[in-house]
Amino acid sequence: MIILASHSPRRQELLKRIVPDFESHPASINERALPVLDPPAYVQSLATAKGQSLVPSYPGATIIAADTMVAFQGKLLGKPHDRAEAKQMITALGGQTHQVYTGLWVRLDNGSVRQQVVTTDVTFWPLSEADVESYLAEDAYQDKAGAYGIQDAGALLVKSIHGDFYNVMGLPISTLYRMLLAEPQ
């Protein structure tokens, strides 16, 4: 049995590309209780907490947990609370390069645990006020770290990426695939 510690439709869609049969169960953790560390350490601690929270309920299962955040100039950009916060985020990212970090935590059915942080650099085009307003009118910023999804209207903001495209969507499937298949270390 394979468990994805998420109800994210994007993560489910991506995981189906490498694991056709799995169950999705959200992790119940208090993210605010975890100390905010540097971005890579923080996403790894969130992924670890999510995965570990499901171990008691699924002791013999392979559990996959992930957490993705956007960071700009060392500051974490989570999911915007409202349109105004989304506007601030998108405006700040215009013409700049930021990082997308995903912490992966995998507990195999044999009990071994693997962890990794994947980083992707994303550069936005310079954005006018009209560009930002046009993007926000699509409501595509909702429920997205950094207020954009590269798989939808957010793609029009992106000038280039350096790294794993699927990491920006929330699940770096190439890395995850290798974590699932690798020999125990």
Swiss-Prot record:
InterPro entries: ITPase-like_fam, Maf-like. The active site is at D67. It is an enzyme of class 3 (hydrolase). It is found in: Cytoplasm. GO terms for cellular component: cytoplasm. It comes from Lacticaseibacillus casei (strain BL23). One of its GO terms (molecular function) is UTP diphosphatase activity. The record marks R10, T68, Q151 as: Important for substrate specificity. Its main location: cytoplasm. Its cofactor is a divalent metal cation. Keywords: Cytoplasm, Hydrolase, Nucleotide metabolism. It catalyses: dTTP + H2O = dTMP + diphosphate + H(+); UTP + H2O = UMP + diphosphate + H(+). Its EC number is 3.6.1.9. NCBIfam families: maf. Nucleoside triphosphate pyrophosphatase that hydrolyzes dTTP and UTP. May have a dual role in cell division arrest and in preventing the incorporation of modified nucleotides into cellular nucleic acids. Belongs to the Maf family. YhdE subfamily. It comes from the Bacteria. GO terms for biological process: nucleotide metabolic process. This is dTTP/UTP pyrophosphatase.
